[in-house]
């Protein structure tokens, strides 16, 4: 299981609203390619880019930028962020 859950913070909400990005907490050994494939297959979107950070608790945070054709707010509402 590559993606554990969406990350819902104030910064994540700003990224979603203004930059068309979603944030997820992922398995620490997941690669950017693994994360992109999981996001594209689970949420039926196209990924433009991914930035990752390893958090202090050992999990990996992935910041996923969606293509211009996909709306991050619509995807977030489908997966239950709101």
From Swiss-Prot:
The gene is rpl23. This is Large ribosomal subunit protein uL23. GO terms for cellular component: ribonucleoprotein complex; ribosome. Transmembrane segments: none annotated. Belongs to the universal ribosomal protein uL23 family. HAMAP family: Ribosomal_uL23_A (MF_01369_A). One of its GO terms (biological process) is translation. One of its GO terms (molecular function) is rRNA binding. Pfam families: Ribosomal_L23. The lineage of its organism: Archaea, Methanobacteriati, Methanobacteriota, Stenosarchaea group, Halobacteria. It comes from the Archaea. Keywords: Ribonucleoprotein, Ribosomal protein, RNA-binding, rRNA-binding. InterPro entries: Nucleotide-bd_a/b_plait_sf, Ribosomal_uL23, Ribosomal_uL23-like, Ribosomal_uL23/eL15/eS24_sf. Part of the 50S ribosomal subunit. Contacts protein L29. Binds to 23S rRNA. One of the proteins that surrounds the polypeptide exit tunnel on the outside of the ribosome. Coiled coil: none annotated.
